Regions:
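Short, flexible helix-loop junctions that flank or precede catalytic/ligand sites
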Residues: 1-166
Length: 168
């Protein structure tokens, strides 16, 4: 093989939801106290930037505890009203699921899961949302139907029916 490099340049400034021309419903979702909110789309579609804008909105408007779990950390937050702890998979933690399990012991109000790739992470994120946390996550899907299919397909057969009942 040959040596190759891929570099993604990101702006140091986190754009606001208004600057991203996001609909007002995202501001409303950022004000929720619990639930599971998924941002979906293909690689490079703006999922991380959208979530950064949402977390930054929360940071500027709400005194709360936010934990982000990312691979890699793409934006650094300056703490304002919120206390924000950022974890990077591979550096601070070994996996999304272990980081999420650990985060739940730290009494967060808001949790950002950079990618929900496997059943354990998805299950923990759903449990966190059901137990009173506001959870944001991403999936590489292009429609609501594909997102539900991806979540259900990640679950073992014994859990698929329960997930269908909870989220449809």
């Amino acid at each position: 093989g040959r040596l190759a490099c891929c570099i993604r340049l990101l702006n140091n400034k986190i754009p606001t939801l208004e600057e991203l021309k996001m609909p007002p419903v995202l501001t409303e979702l950022a004000q929720k106290r619990r639930g599971l909110i998924l941002v979906t789309g293909p690689t490079g579609s703006g999922k991380s930037t959208t979530l950064a804008a949402i977390i930054d909105y929360i940071n500027k408007n709400r005194a709360c505890h936010v934990i982000t779990i990312e691979d890699p950390v793409e934006y650094k937050y300056t703490q304002e009203k919120a206390t924000i702890h950022q974890r990077e998979v591979g550096r601070d933690v070994d996996s999304f699921s272990n980081a999420l399990r650990s985060a739940l012991r730290e009494d967060p109000d808001v949790i950002l899961v950079g990618e929900m790739r496997d059943y354990e992470t998805i299950s923990l994120a759903m449990t966190a949302a059901e137990t009173g946390h506001l959870v944001f996550g991403t999936l590489h899907t292009s429609s609501a139907a594909q997102t539900m299919d991806r979540i259900i397909d990640a679950c073992p057969p014994h859990a698929q029916e329960q997930v269908c009942l909870l989220y449809t």
